[in-house]
Amino acid sequence: MKIDGRPYRTIFPEADGDAVMVIDQTRLPFAFELKRLTNLDDAAVAIRTMVVRGAPLIGVTAAYGMALAMRQDASEAGIERASATLAATRPTAINLRWALDRMAAVLRRAPESAREALAFTEAAAIADEDVASCRAIGEHGAKILSEIAAKKDGPVNVLTHCNAGWLATVDWGTALAPIYVAHDAGVPVHVFVDETRPRNQGAALTAFELNAHGVPHTVIADNAGGHLMQHGQVDVCIVGSDRTTASGDVCNKIGTYLKALAATDNRIPFYAALPFSTIDWTLSDGVRDIPIEERDAREVTHLTGRTDDGAFATVAVVSPGSPVANPAFDVTPARLVTGIITERGVCDASEDGLAGLYPERRRAA
């Protein structure tokens, strides 16, 4: 995608190969800055502190983190150490584990002397595959939006939660990819953007993306979605996913489940958009089995923003001494999901639906 007319990916190696560059998402939407990753620890910290975030991008960053680690230690012990360090950064996104397993398998087949170069080649391949997958998700999802547009006057009103756009992937995004493809094809689209507390990833990141692409949108408070649905102002919901089970349960940013409940109650289609690397074929009960990351209470108790004079300030918003819980994700059961949009097409949120698109994955599970 483009920033000020210049194309960017969220992660890419420097031209001289000395470092891997990422967009520092903690600085958005008020500053666009690139950050250099030069070693394993840099990559791990970037994932843990959410300089990079979004399940697909976390996976690609982990792949490049493995490549950077091979510069210091390409031994079997080095592979194990790098994989363990990166795997410990964030527990919910399955793309992280998928990318690490793929990298380790490729590296172990090569002699130690060849592992550094091979690691960068494989990480680049994973990044390119992510771009292709997200573009395909966009094409399949745009057909849904086009069908809705053909049946109504005015724009298709899409509600989305958190950020599942190009900032969450290498390019294009998952939930936002259909919106970009449809918009570029001339389909009138308007997006309701949940602010997505506590980190405000919708207000800060999704709105930033949509602004940059020229897509009409409105930022709304997290609790406004149900009201809009009741009054016929939402045509479809599209969200991303950090882990989806083989049975179609969708784990996504906290608050997604509530949107799905409201959509079901108001007979509004609710889709999850995700690549194959987000599917965990080993799990069937997402509510029971998906580990949910518990993040720092300070994300809830404090807000950081830009003041009217251009300075940045962090302020407390919670009564001092009150206990805080901060689960980062929730699970939407498959029964509430209209369909899953993947790079291979759209399917029912069910074991049979997913297996129909990925028969080889089901056999391999």
Curated annotation (Swiss-Prot):
Keyword check for Amino-acid biosynthesis: yes
Pathway(s) annotated for this protein in UniProt: Amino-acid biosynthesis; L-methionine biosynthesis via salvage pathway; L-methionine from S-methyl-5-thio-alpha-D-ribose 1-phosphate: step 1/6
Gene3D superfamilies: translation initiation factor eif-2b, domain 1, Translation initiation factor eif-2b, domain 2
Pfam family, any one: IF-2B
GO biological process: L-methionine salvage from methylthioadenosine
Gene Ontology MF: a single term: S-methyl-5-thioribose-1-phosphate isomerase activity
InterPro entries: IF-2B-related, IF-M1Pi, IF_2B-like_C, Initiation_fac_2B_a/b/d, M1Pi_N, NagB/RpiA_transferase-like
Key word Amino-acid biosynthesis present: yes
EC number: 5.3.1.23
Domain of life: Bacteria
Signal peptide from the UniProt entry: none
Residues noted as binding substrate in the record, renumbered to the chain: R53, G54, A55, R90, Q201, N252, K253
Active site per UniProt: D242 (proton donor)
Keyword set, alphabetical order: Amino-acid biosynthesis, Isomerase, Methionine biosynthesis
Protein name per the record: Methylthioribose-1-phosphate isomerase
Gene name of the record: mtnA
